[in-house]
Amino acid sequence: MASESSIPLYDCLIIGGGIAGLSSALSLVRTLHTAVVFDEGIHRNDQAPHLATVPTWDSQDPKRFRDAAKLNILSKYSTVEFANVKLEKFNKALGKPFLTKVFGHDYVVLPSKYFDDIKRASPQSLSFFQALSDGLNMEASVGHLYASTTEIDVVVKHLNPRLTQLTPLLCDEAEYAIEREVGALPDWKKFNVSNLIAAIVHRTTNRILVGKELCRNEEYLAITTKFSRSLFISGIFWNFVRLGPLRKLVAWLTIGLHLRDRNAAAKVLLPHVLARRQEKEAGVDVATKYPDALQWTIDTAPSFPGDDEPLHQVYHMLHLTFAASSASGVGVTQCLLNVLAYPEYLEPLRDEISTVVARHGGWTDKALSQMALLDSFIRETMRLHPAGSFMDDHFRFHDGLTLPKGTNIIAPALAIHYDPDNYEDAHRFDGFRFARYRQKQGENHRWLASTIDQKFLQFGYGNHACPGRFYAIRKIKLVLAKLIMDYDFKWAQPRPVHDRPEDFAIEAQLVAAPDAEILIRSRNLSN
């Protein structure tokens, strides 16, 4: 075994997948750790020498591991396929971590016994945004924007406390978005489900982010969609290229497409920021006039030099849009695919929604909170179709396990969600599973779709879980509920009952099948 004293310490980068995925990336920046050493599967790690002795998932053939991770970018082989097997071999049977490659970086996959240590890790030791910035090469387009806590402050201090009052605005925009993207359909019409839901959710999300005027500005909607797409593509792609220390330099030189989209989006948004700043200086009650994240960003005290500059505030809004729209869109898409695959749930869901809305006199926040069957359906969908096969959570551990600064650490979310020790009949979709749990065990809040625990990692875990999950679940509920109340659905090409298109994996990132097509028809207009 290697000596601990011979292993150097490095600055840490921790990257993860997911909607939450994106919003739960953390970086270990303060605490020094020494190395953990194992006997099995020794190999030399070219990116992180301090992890040279951690076993890989394919310990007998490390080259096969590297080729799969670096070359087969779209293959499930390097992530989804081995997750359950290696959870059993290392995480469960031995209680040990193992090493794998995700998005071009080496990661130590942790057993769940370390999650309580993760939960207690302080914000002073874990930096939310720096890892995300490094992983997506964001410094090339927005500099050190992610050294700021502005986006977290906007969500935690402004958005979350106002969610009850904001629900009617979300409802109004969801109705408008569905009318624009679907409309009245007396006859069946074919849609690509991922594209349709992405458009609806993007519109709905922006009502709370930038207000009614901008969220219905077709130019702004189009360019922010392009911005989000090019941000992900330009950021992720270069993590797979074998350029070693030159990778970051090449990423800087080839980011032109994303910079074009960033500048086009900023051109539309910047005048609104400047106008609101002028109104605020003139004494206008902007907090009441503009109940949206754009105004909260302007009002938030700067946490990093430059945060109070108009262009920085524009960039913060664009990146909030990127995080908030994509995650919820995938969530609604996965749920809608399950509505088609498991039609036995449709009428009970419709009955609950109509009853609760009538009881509360409309689509209020209280009404959404009492849709227990819908909430369970969403949580069960997320359990079986999480945003990533791995999620990132981290820190110093109770049993003496230590890792050096520089260690990327993730949790095997997909394997944990499918573990029969965690869920009865774990591989079967049971849409009302968590509604029964809430009744039987009398723990109403424990099993909500927005509640996190060691067995449900859709939004991360502990103090560093996604702070926007409460907003995300409200959007998913509203859009999904309104769709299933107003429309009928069927597959564009007939499928057996309980069969649905397979998820698409971009390494650890899981999304609903991008080519899935469905037919939609209005319920009250059908011929």
From Swiss-Prot:
It is an enzyme of class 1 (oxidoreductase). GO terms for biological process: secondary metabolic process. Its cofactor is heme. It holds the Pfam family p450. This is Cytochrome P450 monooxygenase aclB. PANTHER family: CYTOCHROME P450 (PTHR46206), P450, PUTATIVE (EUROFUNG)-RELATED (PTHR46206:SF7). Its EC number is 1.-.-.-. Heme binds at C466. One of its GO terms (molecular function) is oxidoreductase activity, acting on paired donors, with incorporation or reduction of molecular oxygen. Pathway: Mycotoxin biosynthesis. The gene is aclB.
